[in-house]
Curated annotation (Swiss-Prot):
InterPro entries cross-referenced by the UniProt entry: DALR_anticod-bd, Gly-tRNA-synth_bsu, Gly-tRNA-synth_heterodimer
Cellular localisation: Cytoplasm
Example of a GO cellular component annotation carried by this entry: cytosol
UniProt organism field: Histophilus somni (strain 129Pt) (Haemophilus somnus)
Class in the EC hierarchy, top level: ligase
The protein's assembly and partners: Tetramer of two alpha and two beta subunits.
NCBIfam families the UniProt entry points to: glyS
Gene: glyS
Protein name, entry field: Glycine--tRNA ligase beta subunit
UniProt-listed Enzyme Commission number(s): 6.1.1.14
Domain of life: Bacteria
GO term, biological process aspect, one: arginyl-tRNA aminoacylation
Family: Belongs to the class-II aminoacyl-tRNA synthetase family.
Length: 688
């Protein structure tokens, strides 16, 4: 079948930069989905995104839907004709619905009899007649939280739409999208190239847009250009550019034709902690900082302009002029903050509520101080340092710098603590208390910092659950899911010997009579353990493996993790499926047992199969106990996997629920002991 390339470009006003890539990829995915639903064959869908446009290009799109052969079965021949051989009303009605006469119907013979049948070929629709509807639906399905109207139009979109370009090969697809008639016109750069021009063919996009309109429509091309040029510019200055993926994509979304330039600021600003300078450069100005080979900030930065004059000096001067007041503010705040010690800011924490029912930030720091000390004692950290860091943990929130540059909380506490002469472990803990801040973030380095980070997060979890405000649906205003996962990561990855039930109980006690939820400890522990599921699923671990461990509810996260790893390994063994099925059978038998179950008595065994299993179970009971104590659950399950043959032989040749009570009790005891061996690791019966 003949194919053509299809272009759809939606020309808009400036789109939200942080949402641009998501909108573009969703547009392409939706178009692909609509094409598939329409039965239109194509090779691939490419997407393009720039500040004032979203576009897709469908390569190798068929010019029509394929023809379909349909078969509509009618009544049985025996019911289609009367005794005289005339068509019945049922047959005539069916034929009329097919647009034929009964005489034109074909016959279909099956093993159940002969039937009337109508076979026809339905020609597919032309692609050009379907494209407007496909694009309309694809745009309607975009993830746009807030839409807007413009002019006197009733249509709504993320930003006002000015042009719609729909080309199927060289043909213009006429129609209306979002209240705008389609055409061949595309708009160029606001200041460079041609303001607007026409395309003769879909294949001219995006190259002609770059040549005549000075717009690089390919998002990934712009991104790669910015990244490569920024690195070159930084190297020329003897440094390395700090280019985070999120900021790189935001900057890519802000420019149509990137021009990467460098500028500088006064060296005196380097006396201010680098984090504060970087915060304003990245967050406010969308600049890329430059560091030397030792990781020290250089007095230079990289920015990306959307215009490309022959002499860029005025643009460079303008950016230097814009950033100078922000850096001056940071310098002033820093110098002012140094005049007062962190500890002297404690009284001001009494004026700030953490949560109305849970008290002030000063109340919270007192709880963190106490809980950090408890945790430190259990993990081998310095209690005095942990408590000191807990006491000072929120003091930097009262500084000018953090008030103005909120994302510097923690790191400014570290710098101020160093200036105050606090111990280095204490200072570092003030910064690392917030780690991990996001998925994949680094963890606190020292055990002192781990103590404070855990204390802070568990205090928040316990307090909010304690007043009955656990997360509902997607709402999570206190970021409790992130806090819970952060605790699990710290405990598991640092292999800390902490029991959640114990720590949460201690945290609960520190609230005094403020908490109203009597089940707070169990609810917090269950909530935290529940976070394991998302973590392990992201690693590709099967859900039933996680559920098998959750069924046992081990409350030590490091122990929980060891069990999951062991069961995940066990699941790969040849005997795993049979043993899981056997455990299900054992569970069902024991659940129906109506007599007391004692210990195994080898002397009561009658059948060789039951004696063999009993001996194997008793032998393994002794062998696995040291391994259980060591937490070597993989070795435990490897040993238990050897029970497959004696278990199979037992169920093949032994009846458990016999009339003779002593024999029945002993056989139930064998199964109970067997079950308990597995349950010391996980509930294997849950495995699918």
């Amino acid at each position: 079948m003949t194919t053509q390339n299809f272009l759809a470009e939606i020309g808009t006003e400036e789109l939200p930069p942080k949402a641009l890539k998501k909108l573009a990829t969703a547009f392409a995915e939706n178009v692909e989905q609509e094409l598939n639903q329409a039965g239109l064959a194509f090779e691939k869908v490419e997407w393009f995104a720039a500040p004032r446009r979203l576009a897709v290009k469908v390569l190798g799109l068929a010019e029509a839907q394929p023809s379909k052969q349909v078969e509509k079965r009618g009544p049985a021949v025996s019911a289609a004709f009367d005794a005289e051989g005339k068509p019945t009303k049922a047959a005539e009605g069916w034929a009329r619905g097919c647009g034929i006469t009964v005489e034109q119907a074909e016959r279909l013979s099956t093993d159940k009899g002969e039937w009337l049948v109508h076979r026809a070929v339905i020609e597919g629709q032309l692609t050009k007649n379907l494209l407007v509807g496909i694009i309309d639906k694809a745009l309607a399905g975009l993830p746009i939280p807030k839409t807007m109207r413009w002019g006197d139009k009733t249509e709504q979109f993320v930003r006002p739409v000015h042009t719609v370009t729909l080309l199927f090969g060289a043909d213009l697809i006429e129609g209306e999208i979002l209240g705008v008639a389609s055409g061949r016109t595309v708009r160029g750069h606001r200041f460079l190239g041609e303001r607007e021009f026409s395309l003769d063919h879909a294949d001219q996009y995006p190259q002609l847009l770059k040549e005549r309109g000075s717009v690089v429509a390919d998002f990934n091309e712009r991104k790669a250009l910015i990244l490569a040029t920024s690195r070159e510019k930084a190297t020329a200055l003897g440094g390395v550019a700090d280019i985070e993926e999120e900021l790189l994509e935001e900057v890519t979304s802000l420019v149509e034709y990137p021009n990467v330039l460098t500028a500088k600021f006064e060296e005196r600003f380097l006396a201010v902690p680098a984090e504060a300078l970087v915060y304003t450069m990245k967050g406010d100005q969308k600049y890329f900082p430059i560091y030397d080979k030792d990781g020290k900030l250089l007095p230079h930065f990289i920015f990306v302009s959307n215009i490309n004059p022959d002499d860029p000096s005025k643009i460079i001067e303008g950016n230097e002029k814009v950033v100078r007041p922000r850096l001056t503010d940071a310098e002033f705040f820093f110098k002012t903050d140094l005049k007062q010690k962190l500890e002297d800011r404690l009284p001001r924490l009494e004026t700030v509520l953490f949560q109305q029912q849970l008290g002030t930030l000063r109340d919270k720091t007192a709880r963190i101080e106490a809980l950090a000390g408890e945790i430190a004692a259990q993990i081998g950290a310095d209690q005095t340092k942990a408590k000191r860091a807990g006491l000072l943990s929120k003091c930097d929130l009262m500084t000018n710098m953090v008030f103005e540059f909120t994302d510097t909380q923690g790191v400014m506490g570290m710098h101020y603590a160093r200036h105050d002469g606090e111990d280095e472990d204490v200072a570092v803990a003030l910064n690392e208390q917030y780690m991990p801040r996001f998925a994949g973030d680094t963890l606190p380095n020292s055990l002192v910092a781990c103590s404070v980070a855990l204390a802070d997060k568990i205090d928040t979890l316990t307090g909010i659950f304690g007043i009955g405000q656990s997360p509902k649906g997607s709402a999570d205003p206190f970021a409790l899911r992130r806090a819970a996962l952060g605790c699990l990561r710290i405990i598991v990855e640092k292999n800390l010997p902490l029991d959640l039930a114990d720590i949460v109980a201690k945290a609960t006690a520190l609230f005094g009579d403020k908490l109203t939820n009597k089940n707070v400890v169990d609810e917090v522990v269950d909530f935290m353990l529940g976070r394991f599921r998302a973590w392990y699923e992201s690693e590709g671990i099967a859900v039933d493996v996680i559920q098998s461990v959750l069924a046992r509810r081990p409350t030590k996260p490091a122990d929980f993790d060891a069990r999951v790893r062991a069961v995940s390994h066990f699941r790969t063994l040849d005997s795993a499926e049979a043993l899981a099925a056997a455990n299900k059978r054992v569970s069902n038998i024991l659940a129906k047992a109506d007599i007391a179950i004692g210990e195994i008595d080898l002397g009561v065994c009658v059948e060789s199969a039951e004696k063999t299993l009993a001996e194997a179970v008793l032998a393994l009971k002794g062998e696995v106990q040291p391994l259980i104590a060591q937490g070597d659950y993989t070795a435990v399950l490897d040993k238990l996997a050897n029970l497959r043959q004696p278990i199979d032989a037992f169920f093949d040749g032994v009846m458990v629920n016999v009339e003779e009570q002593t024999l029945r009790q002993n056989r139930l005891a064998i199964l109970s002991t067997l079950q308990n061996l597995f349950l010391q690791v996980a509930d294997i019966s849950v495995l699918q």
